[in-house]
Amino acid sequence: MKQLHKQMSSKRDEETIPMSQSSPYSPKTLKHPRSLPRSLHYLFREQRLLFILVGILIGSTFFILQPSLSRLGAAESTSLITRSVSYAVTDSPPSRSTFNSGGGGGRTGRVPVGIGRKRLRIVVTGGAGFVGSHLVDKLIGRGDEVIVIDNFFTGRKENLVHLFSNPRFELIRHDVVEPILLEVDQIYHLACPASPVHYKYNPVKTIKTNVMGTLNMLGLAKRVGARFLLTSTSEVYGDPLEHPQKETYWGNVNPIGERSCYDEGKRTAETLAMDYHRGAGVEVRIARIFNTYGPRMCLDDGRVVSNFVAQTIRKHPMTVYGDGKQTRSFQYVSDLVEGLVALMENDHVGPFNLGNPGEFTMLELAEVVKEVIDPSATIEFKPNTADDPHKRKPDISKAKEQLNWEPKISLREGLPRMVSDFRNRILNEDEGKGL
């Protein structure tokens, strides 16, 4: 037995790797290299969960970045994946400029010109409305990702239903008087009832949307570094004493009248926008929009063009308030959309008039509607409404010079396009009522 014990001890000693004679520590027996596979096997078996989590992280990073990588070169793609994985491991998120650098656009949300234009993520408040839905069509058509925020107070899902299957379109039912957190490059803030019928129906809601809604959207723009465009209105000029109206004109507005919830609300929104620009460095654009018409207008929203067209199609008299000598200028909606996009992409801060300088009295407009729809249509006169501006015509010299923009579609060219849309909708409405 002693002989066997000596043999086994001798065998273990042969496998022992002696340490240096000068070491102050007692020698330890090291495992033979042949035992390493057993250690790796133990590691893989006992730490499977860790390896699974790392694999999921790497795979998720690849699939998230896949749309961006498809537009980048091979070297740039590899660099982007490496940066993203390193951020995930160190738990330190990249700044916005990390992914915007070299891709165009940057933190300001400006759209670069050229084939390799960076796809932007854009939010449009009030995007289910008349103007908003046409703007969304434009942005989707050029390849951007668009998020529409609307509470459907005046907006209609029918204006956007053709985009529901588009992967670059998203619709959120939300009221802008409440904050919302999104990551976007540009903000088009259109949310607010623009028709007298709607904003007089709920004046408190109207001014809250103008003030609180604008505050929330400006706060979002500040947090994420987005460029912000406010759609203001020619109503900020009130009943003007200057004709035509330039952007430098301060206006003549009744601050306590029936229309003031909208007029003064928009003036306050402009003030907030410029204060955020001066105080917080937010890039703001202000579009003072004059009378606009076109498809998707509400059939009975009280605005003069939609009123005249709907009344004539239904064989009702056209309602003219006052003597009919008030003047307005009318721009087609596609011209306005082009102006909004040009303003957003331009580097000029501050207000711009966007409108058609062609001026018509209400009686002249009624005659054009009769020419297009029904020469036998009649006119009915009613007392004028309170605070109705007598004249309204934009001076668009600034937009021409700095934005290279001016309207292209005349009233006689654009009105038939609107009439076609109104005929179809009124016909469908009558069929739904069984008329």
Curated annotation (Swiss-Prot):
GO cellular component: Golgi cisterna membrane
Disordered as annotated region, ranges: 1-33, 91-110, 380-401
Lumenal side: 70-435
Entry annotation: catalytic residues: 262
GO molecular function: NAD+ binding; UDP-glucuronate decarboxylase activity
Reaction catalysed by this enzyme: UDP-alpha-D-glucuronate + H(+) = UDP-alpha-D-xylose + CO2
Keyword list, A-Z: Decarboxylase, Golgi apparatus, Lyase, Membrane, NAD, Signal-anchor, Transmembrane, Transmembrane helix
Membrane association type: Single-pass type II membrane protein
CDD domains per UniProt: UGD_SDR_e
InterPro entries: NAD(P)-bd_dom, NAD(P)-bd_dom_sf, UXS-like
Tissue and organ distribution: Ubiquitous.
Pathway(s) the chain acts in: Nucleotide-sugar biosynthesis; UDP-alpha-D-xylose biosynthesis; UDP-alpha-D-xylose from UDP-alpha-D-glucuronate: step 1/1
Pfam families membership: GDP_Man_Dehyd
Gene3D superfamilies per UniProt: NAD(P)-binding Rossmann-like Domain
Subcellular location, record wording: Golgi apparatus, Golgi stack membrane
Annotated residues for binding of NAD(+): 129-131, 150-151, 153-155, 175-176, 190, 209, 262, 266, 292, 303
Transmembrane segments: 49-69
Topological domain spans for side Cytoplasmic: 1-48
Polar residues biased stretches: 91-100
UniProt record, GO biological process: D-xylose metabolic process; UDP-D-xylose biosynthetic process
Named cofactor requirement(s): NAD(+)
Function summary: Catalyzes the NAD-dependent decarboxylation of UDP-glucuronic acid to UDP-xylose. Necessary for the biosynthesis of the core tetrasaccharide in glycosaminoglycan biosynthesis.
Family assignment from sequence similarity: Belongs to the NAD(P)-dependent epimerase/dehydratase family. UDP-glucuronic acid decarboxylase subfamily.
Protein known as: UDP-glucuronic acid decarboxylase 1
Species assigned in the record: Arabidopsis thaliana
Gene that produces this protein: UXS1
